[in-house]
């Protein structure tokens, strides 16, 4: 066997007949499988032990040789070699075909490789291969054309005309094989290159295609005639198994049936040839053999598929590779693993952030080998077998050992769907009773888990390296930030928010108001004994609290509440005392107005203070972000645990309940609705009189009901009591929002009809009053549509993520600095007047390219190649700088990846990114994971002013990444200059826009209904949009340069996500967009070996040019190509990655002809062949590190093997 971690690359080529023979261990001559009585494989059949090896380890077929000591001997009676039965997975056989057979992949694929090689149409090829026509192989002296096609009748006529033997014409694959042998590759290639110099149009396209295929054959050393098979390999029997079912029947792989048909037809053909049967019968048999081989290779590719019982198409070799159930995606990219389990999850509120609860029964099964080793080491049992029996009996002594074994041994928890890297995290297991896994409530948000029956899988990392990685890199307490935007992902939610909200509320005039305490303990004691309430405003000596007071705040009395004293007690030292829920208090310290000199009239001072709002979910998020910024991970996760405990405790104490009386009644609801009814009546009257159109009437009516709903909502907000439990839940951010509340207390409002149009009849009732039957019926449609949309969106979003991962999986941080001389100019992203992404956010965590100076004073704010921190970013923006040149992924020169400086910080950790970080995969997950939050709809831009639907939400993201022509496309200018005129042409219903520049004039025809973005006198740049709508990126690439397209795509993706309130770091989108523009198309090869029209990687193109320029030749020219992510994935240099993505057969066909070599640079290729992936600790620079165990553990694998061998020998003797 090949050592997986040793080889550097993998190549795929066409197999020559001699190669197939060298693989084979013998010829399969009979279609039989196994003998129905003895159940032993038949001789010369598809399961023959002589060819494929023994069915039992170390035992020949007849039983003469048994046991390992006869290893390598071939039995003289039955001819079977004594070896492991595992060889039946590796040894191949072959079938000697009695007639050449065409390989369907090369004849039927698009484009047909055989057709291009021979310059014949696929239709003509099909007629020849399936014996419907003759092809001229050698016209000799006749006027017949070489490779011309003729029917049977024409053939006979020509024979009569020119005489027998005057020319050679044949049919079937044999004819094609002869033609392929005649192809002189160097000569054909030279002729095509000549032709390309003058050809144009269709002719040119065809020549480029032919040249591509012929050049591939020539360079790879494959011979074209190998596309025709003379010998057919038979795959090992264990890869097409036959198993006995309970009822004594057999279930066999479909491949056996397909092979049987081939062998039957091949044998029949051999017999017919021996008997010198009539030509027509032989021809028919050859055609049937061709069809049988076609079905074996790719059933259903041509004609009707061969079916099995119940007219189910049989699964051929191609189907074994294709699709989600195929070899690539089912067995190579994802395998089922041992040391794993799954169970329902339940909440573990008492756990620490790095812990999870594992049921005892599950743990003993998962850690069985570890426990067994310990049992043997402690001499509780003599050997491994006895230890196993102890565990199976459930001996009491095993539980203590299990406790010790799992200590410090992390486990991984995973919840499907794993949308981003936070879907798998490591925890320290804690043994619990029951059968459900316990999960820490704060990690739920990262997993998107809840406790309504969700299940999770658990995995045990075995090796010391794996345990170390799980503990250091994957521990849940380390994952505070979300990789997509660098914001905390573990903000408290629901009860925790509610508890802290209740705790930090303030009340005027509560019992004990104005009491002064010497320290926190005294305040808590007073609260416990009922002298003060949590919400009571009291005073406390500042010196007793360990907080960073300003000088004027020391030795004072501070006015606060008992709840806030408790809330601040859990905060880390060094954080200001949090009195107001705002950022100023958090970053700059407690405001001075809360401090008094000791002995002042505190009651009067308190009475003058306004009531502060409590801390809401958003405020807690800000506090966590600030603490992470100051104290990093460990302190943050400890604080989160304290916040969680405090929140749960006080939400329990608060005892919030919800009853129907908590839903207020709006006193003037009837009046508001009555007014709206009158207004609607007036609108209808106007319509009946013909004063407004039907569309205007519809818009006015729906607007009227919307405003009625808003009035009720406004009234609700005015009336709401801050102590109302529903209001508290809503205001704190624990659950629900104003729209839920207004449906409970106001009115439900307008609903959408099944066709998506909003119905004019609103639902006037709310849930407190109850809906009428008709209203209920109206509202069901919206509810169902919501469920359906969610389901469809999830699938769409998952597929988008898969394509994104595929295109960027080989983007890894490869070096420290690429030394590029280019940078990216960035400014705020805006849409009209609306701010999409401010400059400050875009600058954070990036490196500068040029020095940034203060625009007024000229002082240097930051030099080149330096990291822009949050504070520096704020300083740059405050100085009034509008544009900064930064290092960007777009301009990075690193091959097969990105350098650290162009990428910036790793958003998941807040630190500089490490070499080896798989930033491509992180980028793909960051863009794909929020996909489910985007809408599915394509919106109308409203009103009559526009006829274009602007695509938004998920469909727009797909449109951008697939580089499709957008709906509602904008017209762009190719000239830089001034708009000199806009003329309307009523006859053609169009407008004409005239742009005049230094280089020339442009005239652009715009649809009449399109909304103009420019006016006469405006200055426009090249590629600027003249009308509203999305620019077609491929068109922009023609007019402008690559960087302009990249910048445009980046801002377009941000617009979609930001409009839905989803924040994504620019760098993730940069990584994806860069992958879409990696290729160039060669326009003129110059003196290089490149072929015209070839698509190639930009780095390979530059290398080829560099070589030629050094030698003093003319370099090639090329044009950048923008590819959608699906196409870019399929065009990757790695055929393994492309084949496992989509269109498996097409990718493999192409790779084989080209003799492609996969250098295993990406992650996917390495996963497929089972090699350690070249990212993180798998990179070459980290590969040879030896793990050092802290305490030496005795490894007892050898003893186990010795024991088992001894037992086996003992059994042999007793037999």
UniProtKB/Swiss-Prot annotation:
<comment type="subunit">
    <text>The RNAP catalytic core consists of 2 alpha, 1 beta, 1 beta' and 1 omega subunit. When a sigma factor is associated with the core the holoenzyme is formed, which can initiate transcription.</text>
</comment>
<feature type="binding site">
    <location>
        <position position="78"/>
    </location>
    <ligand>
        <name>Zn(2+) 1</name>
    </ligand>
</feature>
<comment type="function">
    <text>DNA-dependent RNA polymerase catalyzes the transcription of DNA into RNA using the four ribonucleoside triphosphates as substrates.</text>
</comment>
<feature type="binding site">
    <location>
        <position position="899"/>
    </location>
    <ligand>
        <name>Zn(2+) 2</name>
    </ligand>
</feature>
<dbReference type="InterPro" id="IPR007081">
    <property type="entry name" value="RNA_pol_Rpb1_5"/>
</dbReference>
<dbReference type="GO" id="GO:0008270">
    <property type="term" value="F:zinc ion binding"/>
</dbReference>
<feature type="binding site">
    <location>
        <position position="818"/>
    </location>
    <ligand>
        <name>Zn(2+) 2</name>
    </ligand>
</feature>
<dbReference type="GO" id="GO:0000428">
    <property type="term" value="C:DNA-directed RNA polymerase complex"/>
</dbReference>
<dbReference type="InterPro" id="IPR012754">
    <property type="entry name" value="DNA-dir_RpoC_beta_prime_bact"/>
</dbReference>
<dbReference type="GO" id="GO:0006351">
    <property type="term" value="P:DNA-templated transcription"/>
</dbReference>
<feature type="binding site">
    <location>
        <position position="60"/>
    </location>
    <ligand>
        <name>Zn(2+) 1</name>
    </ligand>
</feature>
<dbReference type="InterPro" id="IPR038120">
    <property type="entry name" value="Rpb1_funnel_sf"/>
</dbReference>
<feature type="binding site">
    <location>
        <position position="454"/>
    </location>
    <ligand>
        <name>Mg(2+)</name>
    </ligand>
</feature>
<dbReference type="InterPro" id="IPR042102">
    <property type="entry name" value="RNA_pol_Rpb1_3_sf"/>
</dbReference>
<dbReference type="Pfam" id="PF04983">
    <property type="entry name" value="RNA_pol_Rpb1_3"/>
</dbReference>
<keyword id="KW-0548">Nucleotidyltransferase</keyword>
<dbReference type="Pfam" id="PF04997">
    <property type="entry name" value="RNA_pol_Rpb1_1"/>
</dbReference>
<comment type="similarity">
    <text>Belongs to the RNA polymerase beta' chain family.</text>
</comment>
<keyword id="KW-0862">Zinc</keyword>
<feature type="binding site">
    <location>
        <position position="452"/>
    </location>
    <ligand>
        <name>Mg(2+)</name>
    </ligand>
</feature>
<dbReference type="GO" id="GO:0003899">
    <property type="term" value="F:DNA-directed RNA polymerase activity"/>
</dbReference>
<keyword id="KW-0808">Transferase</keyword>
<keyword id="KW-0804">Transcription</keyword>
<protein>
    <recommendedName>
        <fullName>DNA-directed RNA polymerase subunit beta'</fullName>
        <ecNumber>2.7.7.6</ecNumber>
    </recommendedName>
</protein>
<keyword id="KW-0240">DNA-directed RNA polymerase</keyword>
<feature type="binding site">
    <location>
        <position position="902"/>
    </location>
    <ligand>
        <name>Zn(2+) 2</name>
    </ligand>
</feature>
<dbReference type="InterPro" id="IPR007080">
    <property type="entry name" value="RNA_pol_Rpb1_1"/>
</dbReference>
<dbReference type="InterPro" id="IPR044893">
    <property type="entry name" value="RNA_pol_Rpb1_clamp_domain"/>
</dbReference>
<dbReference type="GO" id="GO:0000287">
    <property type="term" value="F:magnesium ion binding"/>
</dbReference>
<dbReference type="GO" id="GO:0003677">
    <property type="term" value="F:DNA binding"/>
</dbReference>
<keyword id="KW-0479">Metal-binding</keyword>
<dbReference type="InterPro" id="IPR007083">
    <property type="entry name" value="RNA_pol_Rpb1_4"/>
</dbReference>
<dbReference type="Pfam" id="PF00623">
    <property type="entry name" value="RNA_pol_Rpb1_2"/>
</dbReference>
<dbReference type="InterPro" id="IPR006592">
    <property type="entry name" value="RNA_pol_N"/>
</dbReference>
<dbReference type="Pfam" id="PF04998">
    <property type="entry name" value="RNA_pol_Rpb1_5"/>
</dbReference>
<feature type="binding site">
    <location>
        <position position="75"/>
    </location>
    <ligand>
        <name>Zn(2+) 1</name>
    </ligand>
</feature>
<dbReference type="InterPro" id="IPR045867">
    <property type="entry name" value="DNA-dir_RpoC_beta_prime"/>
</dbReference>
<feature type="binding site">
    <location>
        <position position="892"/>
    </location>
    <ligand>
        <name>Zn(2+) 2</name>
    </ligand>
</feature>
<dbReference type="InterPro" id="IPR007066">
    <property type="entry name" value="RNA_pol_Rpb1_3"/>
</dbReference>
<feature type="binding site">
    <location>
        <position position="450"/>
    </location>
    <ligand>
        <name>Mg(2+)</name>
    </ligand>
</feature>
<feature type="binding site">
    <location>
        <position position="62"/>
    </location>
    <ligand>
        <name>Zn(2+) 1</name>
    </ligand>
</feature>
<keyword id="KW-0460">Magnesium</keyword>
């Amino acid at each position: 066997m090949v050592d997986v971690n040793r080889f550097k690359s993998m190549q795929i080529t066409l197999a020559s007949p001699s190669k197939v023979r060298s693989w084979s261990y013998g010829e399969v001559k009979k279609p039989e499988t196994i003998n129905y009585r003895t159940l032993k494989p038949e001789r010369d059949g598809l399961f023959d032990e002589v060819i494929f090896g023994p069915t039992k380890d170390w035992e020949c077929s007849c039983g003469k040789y048994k046991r390992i000591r006869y290893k390598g001997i071939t039995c003289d009676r039955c001819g079977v070699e004594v070896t492991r039965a595992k060889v039946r997975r590796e040894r191949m056989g072959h079938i000697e075909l009695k007639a050449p057979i065409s390989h369907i992949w090369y004849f039927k694929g698009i484009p047909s490789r055989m057709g291009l090689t021979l310059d014949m149409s696929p239709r003509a090829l099909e007629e020849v291969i399936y014996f419907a026509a003759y092809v001229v192989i050698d016209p000799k002296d006749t006027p017949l054309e070489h490779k011309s096609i003729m029917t049977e009748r024409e053939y006979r006529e020509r024979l009569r005309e020119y005489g027998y033997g005057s020319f050679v014409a044949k049919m079937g694959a044999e004819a094609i094989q002869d033609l392929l042998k005649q192809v002189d590759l160097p000569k054909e290639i030279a002729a095509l290159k000549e032709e390309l110099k003058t050809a144009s149009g269709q002719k040119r396209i065809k020549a480029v295609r032919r040249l591509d295929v012929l050049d591939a054959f020539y360079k790879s050393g494959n011979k074209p005639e190998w596309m025709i098979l003379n010998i057919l390999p038979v795959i090992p029997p264990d890869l097409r198994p036959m198993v006995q079912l309970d009822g004594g029947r057999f279930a066999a792989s479909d491949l056996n049936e397909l092979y049987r048909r081939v062998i039957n037809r091949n044998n029949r053909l051999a017999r017919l040839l021996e008997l010198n049967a009539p030509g027509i019968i032989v021809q028919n048999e050859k055609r049937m053999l061709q069809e049988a081989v076609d079905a074996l290779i790719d059933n259903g590719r041509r004609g009707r598929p061969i079916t099995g019982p119940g007219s189910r198409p049989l699964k051929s070799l191609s189907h074994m590779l294709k699709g989600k159930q195929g070899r690539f995606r089912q067995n190579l990219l994802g395998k089922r693993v041992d040391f794993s389990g799954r169970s329902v999850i339940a909440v573990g509120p008492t756990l620490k952030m790095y812990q999870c609860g594992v049921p005892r029964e599950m743990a003993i099964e998962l850690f069985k080998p570890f426990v067994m080793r310990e049992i043997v080491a402690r001499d509780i049992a003599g050997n491994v077998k006895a230890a196993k029996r102890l565990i199976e009996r459930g001996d009491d002594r095993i539980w203590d050992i299990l406790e010790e074994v799992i200590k410090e041994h992390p486990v991984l928890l995973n919840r499907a769907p794993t949308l981003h890297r936070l879907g798998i995290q490591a925890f320290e297991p804690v043994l619990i009773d029951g059968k459900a896994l316990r999960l820490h409530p704060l990690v739920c948000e990262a997993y998107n888990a809840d406790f309504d029956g969700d299940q999770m899988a658990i995995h045990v990392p075995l090796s010391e390296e794996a345990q170390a990685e799980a503990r250091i890199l994957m521990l849940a307490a380390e994952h505070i930030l979300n990789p997509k935007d660098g914001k905390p992902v573990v903000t408290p939610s629901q009860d925790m928010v509610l508890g802290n909200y209740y705790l930090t509320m303030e009340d005027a005039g509560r019992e004990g108001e104005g009491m002064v305490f010497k320290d926190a303990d005294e305040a808590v004691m007073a609260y416990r004994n009922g002298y003060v309430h949590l919400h009571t405003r009291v005073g406390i000596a500042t010196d007793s609290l360990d907080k960073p007071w300003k000088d004027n705040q020391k030795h004072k009395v501070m006015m606060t509440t008992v709840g806030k004293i408790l809330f601040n007690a859990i905060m880390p030292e060094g954080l200001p005392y949090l009195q107001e829920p705002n950022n100023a208090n958090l970053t700059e310290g407690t405001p001075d107005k809360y401090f008094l000199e000791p002995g002042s009239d505190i009651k009067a001072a308190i009475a003058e203070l306004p009531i502060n709002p409590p801390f809401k979910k958003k405020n807690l998020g800000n506090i966590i972000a600030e603490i992470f910024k100051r104290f990093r991970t460990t302190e943050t996760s400890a604080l989160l645990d304290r916040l969680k405990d405090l929140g749960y405790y006080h939400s329990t104490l608060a005892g919030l309940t919800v009853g129907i009386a908590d839903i207020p009644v709006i006193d003037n609801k009837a009046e508001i609705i009555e007014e709206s009814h009158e207004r609607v009546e007036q609108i209808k009257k106007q319509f009946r009189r013909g004063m407004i159109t039907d569309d205007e009437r519809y818009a006015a009516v729906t607007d009227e009901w919307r405003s009625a709903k808003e009035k009720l909502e406004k009234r609700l907000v005015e009336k709401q009591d801050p102590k109302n439990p529903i209001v508290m839940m809503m205001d704190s951010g624990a659950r629900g929002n104003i729209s839920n509340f207004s449906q409970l207390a106001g009115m439900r409002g307008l609903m959408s009809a099944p066709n998506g149009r909003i119905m004019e009849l609103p639902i006037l009732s709310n849930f407190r009053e109850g809906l009428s039957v008709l209203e209920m019926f109206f509202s069901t449609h919206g509810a169902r549509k919501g469920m359906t949309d969610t389901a469809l969106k999830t699938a769409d979003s998952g597929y988008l993520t898969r394509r994104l991962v595929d295109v960027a999986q080989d983007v890894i941080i490869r070096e420290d600095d690429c030394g590029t001389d280019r940078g990216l100019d960035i400014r705020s992203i805006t849409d009209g007047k609306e701010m999409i992404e401010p400059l400050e956010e875009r600058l954070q965590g990036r490196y500068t390219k040029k020095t940034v100076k203060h625009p007024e004073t000229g002082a240097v704010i930051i030099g080149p190649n330096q990291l822009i921190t949050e504070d520096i970013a704020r300083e740059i923006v405050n100085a009034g700088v509008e544009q900064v040149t930064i290092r960007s992924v777009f301009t990075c020169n690193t091959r097969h990846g990105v350098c650290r400086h162009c990428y910036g910080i790793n958003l998941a950790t807040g630190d500089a990114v490490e070499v080896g970080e798989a930033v491509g995969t992180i980028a793909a997950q960051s863009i794909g994971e929020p996909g489910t939050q985007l809408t599915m709809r394509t919106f109308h831009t409203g009103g009559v002013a526009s006829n274009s639907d602007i695509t938004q939400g998920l469909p727009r993201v797909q449109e951008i990444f697939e580089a499709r022509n957008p709906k509602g496309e904008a017209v762009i200018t190719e000239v830089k200059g001034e708009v000199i005129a806009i003329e309307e042409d009523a006859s053609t219903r169009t407008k004409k826009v005239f742009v005049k520049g230094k280089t020339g004039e442009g005239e652009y025809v715009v649809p009449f209904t399109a909304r103009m973005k420019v006016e006469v006198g405006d200055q426009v740049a090249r590629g600027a949009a003249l009308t509203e709508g999305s620019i077609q990126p491929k068109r922009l690439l023609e007019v402008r340069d690559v960087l302009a397209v990249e910048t445009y795509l980046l801002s377009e993706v941000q617009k979609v996500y930001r409009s839905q309130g989803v924040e994504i770091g620019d760098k993730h989108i940069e990584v994806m967009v860069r992958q879409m523009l990696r290729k160039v198309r060669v326009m003129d090869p110059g003196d290089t070996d490149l072929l015209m029209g070839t698509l190639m990687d930009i780095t390979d193109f530059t290398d080829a040019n560099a070589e030629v320029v050094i030698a003093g030749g003319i370099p090639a020219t090329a044009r950048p190509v923008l590819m959608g992510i699906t196409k870019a994935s399929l065009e990757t240099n790695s055929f393994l990655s492309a084949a496992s993505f989509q269109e498996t057969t097409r990718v493999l066909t192409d790779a084989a002809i080209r003799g492609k070599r996969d250098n295993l640079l990406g992650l996917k290729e390495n996963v497929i062949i089972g090699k350690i992936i070249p990212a993180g600790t798998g990179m070459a620079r980290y590969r040879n590190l030896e793990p050092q165990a802290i305490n030496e553990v005795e490894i007892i694998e050898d003893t186990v093997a010795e024991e088992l061998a001894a037992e086996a020998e003992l059994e042999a003797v007793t037999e």
